[in-house]
Amino acid sequence: MNKLVSGNNIIPSVNFHLWEPCNMRCKFCFAKFQDVKSTILPKGHLKKEQTLEIVEQLAEYGFQKITFVGGEPTLCPWISELIKKANLLGMTTMIVTNGSNLSKDFLVQNQSYLDWITLSIDSINSSTNKVVGRSTNSIHPDRIYYNQLIQTIYEYGYRLKINTVVTKANLNEDLNDFVNDAKPERWKVFQVLPVRGQNDNDIDELLISEKEFNEYVNRHSKNKFLITETNTDMTNTYVMVDPAGRFFNNQNGNYMYSDHILEVGVQKAFEEMGYNYDKFIDRKGIYQWK
């Protein structure tokens, strides 16, 4: 049943966190899924056939846009198959990536099927990125690194978004010139989000108040690409599927998980969550993604 096109006020976009493994160790990450890995999913991901089936069921239910997230989704050996399947089923396709694994082979292979690339860029200072864990043994991103990456993304014809998480580490930085040069269609700026069971161990030193977040926002308020989200804005407004194939939602600072989509179907699993359509609209969740 295509529930979404029947006129119901149901959020039309879904984030599929298909892959727990990541090659960076961002201290503030709200999607580490160690709880999932330690209890029901030792490998941190489902089998390829299961992930393809989930994509098919999400499309059949009527989701119009799917964002592949991790961990780091480009580490998944069959990510291109998932992107292609989602595209052929009529969904707008997107990935959120740290960019470290965006090879030219990947960009060529997915040209016809992947609509958007969202880069996670919190700082253009390598020292800040090292402090928060946004680096690998060989990659310490700075402005030059990101400029080259963005240029390559545009050369292959992809639409660009940038996601920035504001923490104590980058609170006083200014990304105006960088973002204006990058010209993403959307620059989403998030207040660092504490989630019990995901980032408890490292988050305290990075937390900021809403007042501090607003100071960062005000510094960038004239930036035409800017879209901001406080912790309150984010809560109950993202339809998310975890690596085990369950919808999940942040409720009172904890993740609550639905039954498995492959066992009970999308509709029953979806209805177990308390997603808020009106808040989704308020945070500008609908835009020209086609």
UniProtKB/Swiss-Prot annotation:
- One Gene Ontology MF term: lyase activity
The answer to keyword Magnesium applying to this record is no
SMART domains for the chain: Elp3
Swiss-Prot/TrEMBL GO biological process terms: defense response to virus
| Top-rank EC class of the record's enzyme | lyase
Which Enzyme Commission number(s) are on file for it?
4.2.-.-
**For [4Fe-4S] cluster, which residues are the binding ones?**
C22, C26, C29
Which key words tag this protein in UniProt? 4Fe-4S, Antiviral defense, Iron, Iron-sulfur, Lyase, Metal-binding, S-adenosyl-L-methionine
**Cofactor(s) demanded:** [4Fe-4S] cluster
Tell me the function of this protein: Expression of pVip47 in E.coli (strain MG1655) confers resistance to phage P1; has no effect against T7. Catalyzes the conversion of uridine triphosphate (UTP) to 3'-deoxy-3',4'-didehydro-UTP (ddhUTP), probably via a SAM-dependent radical mechanism. The modified nucleotide represses transcription from T7 RNA polymerase-directed genes (possibly by acting as chain terminators), strongly suggesting these nucleotides block viral polymerase transcription. How this protein allows bacteria to resist viruses that do not encode their own RNA polymerase (such as lambda, P1) is unknown.
Q: Which NCBIfam families match?
A: viperin_w_prok
Under what name is this protein listed? S-adenosylmethionine-dependent nucleotide dehydratase
Give the species.
Flammeovirga pacifica
Q: What is the lineage of its organism?
A: Bacteria, Pseudomonadati, Bacteroidota, Cytophagia, Cytophagales
Gene symbol of the encoding locus = vip47
